[in-house]
Amino acid sequence: MLTDLHKVRNIGIMAHIDAGKTTTTERHLFYTGVNHKLGETHDGGATTDWMEQEKERGITITSAAVTCFWNDHQINIIDNPGHVDFTVEVERSLRVLDGAVAVFDGKEGVEPQSETVWRQADKYDVPRICFVNKMDKLGADFYFTVDTIVKRLGARPLVMQLPIGAENDFVGVVDLISMKAFVWPGDANGIVTMGASYEIEIRQLQEKAEEEYRNELVEAVAETSEELMEKYLEGEELTVEEIQAGVRQLTVNAEAYPVFCGSAFKNRGVQPMLDAVVAYLPNPLDAGPVKGHAVNDEEVVLEREVSKEAPFSALAFKIATHPFFGTLTFIRVYSGRLESGAQVLNATKGKKERIGKLFQMHANKENPVDEVVAGHIYAVIGLKDTTTGDTLCDPANPIILESMTFPEPVISVAIEPKTKGDQEKLSTAIQKLVAEDPTFRVNLNEETGQTEIGGMGELHLDVFVDRMKREFKVEANVGKPQVAYRETIKRKVDKVDYTHKKQTGGSGQFAKVQLSFEPLDTPRGTVYEFENAITGGRVPREYIPSVDAGIQDAMKFGVLAGYPMVRVKATSLDGAYHDVDSSEMAFRIAGSQAFKEGVRKATPIILEPLMAVEVRTPEEFMGDVIGDLNSRRGQIQIQSMEDATGVKVVNALVPLSEMFGYIGDLRSKTQGRAVYSMTFHSYAEVPKAVADEIVQKSQGE
């Protein structure tokens, strides 16, 4: 456990599904001496893939946090999932990292998912270095990959190494700063033993490329300061230290991204990459004090110094269920220190919590520690009310750190226990799983009485159901996936009058409202706005929130097919009340009924989620792929030629309802050679024929 924060790195490893993130992490752990046996993803033995499903599917779903040491530095690594259904995991870990290693597949270059994750990292300004992996693969092309970093990500790569040999003959790299070649000879099986790297001088073969890339690198570094620029222009050589300092500055400011290469699986190029993590990625102090706001006032900005002496503050960024300890809460400590048994304030929820045991995690092995200190990542036991995104702090110095925003689910399944005995287990399971992943939403459908789970995609929900059966031993029936439709209005309706009155002996009920409704033009943002334009006290102030609440009640069920309403602005214009008979309840009912009447007149429509789909296919199947997407009501955006291997890329917007079972159809149409990815794009109006079908279905059930 290092206390000198200059020597600490909190990093994530981010990439596309199969670019080799987990293998890269495993190699980090192997080289830093934490792991004595190598785990391979395709054997299901990787240390960071610790849930059973991950081992089976060979993909990483939850970000495991792992600590290791290299060259007298402590590296806390978070392994991120690369599958698009698990964006929340990536988003979460990026929020608490100081830097990241972006792993690219040397053959594929920047893939759709790498792009999504890269944009998420841009959102949080995370400094990154790039590792072009799988250089030993057939068709691997380092220069093509660097080119895609520029073209697809619009980023500025700093090439730090060039590969020696390609595909099966890939043996090592040339370091462009020291101009030395690092070669990992390996035996006949390509097995490279621990620490067996040695240096040889530059060879004649690649001089031209080396010279070009080294000049580019030196020029980029020279631009970081006037002194270096002068030195460079006068033709003086920059020293190795100057170049490294310049690269570090560009990296920490996220102005450029150093690029390294290797094959993690074949153990080539891993050590220089670890050196680069230490040399170029920021330490917890580089980002400066962490900012937050006062508990009751978002306008009041507060800061906490990154030091042990400052008041304690931390962000809970992940909840995991552990087989023995129950709930583990992963926290990033931004300031101060804390011992186990201490009391903290959950400032987000306004509740006090007591810290139980404290651990530094190594995938799913725990190393107990007595205290936590600023700049590190830990797992805590004993927190009852804390969920993802909550701030924990010193009760005497409350602060709320910037939290995370999570997308709304686009797909849901109905779930019901098979037996009465499963009912209780089911609700416990759902509670725990939702605490772990905030993009799962649980909803009790009042009409059908079923519990519905919403998520980010089919795989996301599959894993949920799978874990429920395995970890919580719940037997449940799972319905077919349902699309999360929404309803809205197309035109403005002025002055909708509604009077609610009841006279039944004793005190009656009376409320009169006049409202106008109009569509809000926000493809993603605001769901609803309410404005009060009543003047002169025609309706007393205290009843206005009830009108608003009544409208929101009615918005839960649209008038066409009962889906939630979105993108509506309501304005209350006028009304009347009665001294004795008016009540909050009466105005709530009036607001609700006026809304239902108004919506019917405002051309109600149904909206459906559109997905941005990207298909990569060999050229000969291009026609079939496009025809198939068209038959699914897809709008083809662009078709483009890809790399030298002749792969074509098709981008389309396709309704989610048409994408069920797509993977099977795509495989059979392209002999399993095409791949696709999809992310939520926006909500759009459903064509009339489809809308009629949806309405009929909802009434027929």
From Swiss-Prot:
Any one of the GO CC terms: cytoplasm
Keywords annotated in UniProt: Cytoplasm, Elongation factor, GTP-binding, Nucleotide-binding, Protein biosynthesis
Pfam families, A to Z: EFG_C (PF00679), EFG_III (PF14492), EFG_IV (PF03764), GTP_EFTU (PF00009), GTP_EFTU_D2 (PF03144)
Annotated protein name in UniProt: Elongation factor G
Gene name of this polypeptide: fusA
This protein's record includes keyword Protein biosynthesis: yes
GO biological process, one term: ribosome disassembly
CDD domains, per database record: EF-G, EFG_III, EFG_mtEFG1_IV, EFG_mtEFG_C, EFG_mtEFG_II
Residue stretches making up the tr-type G domain: 6-285
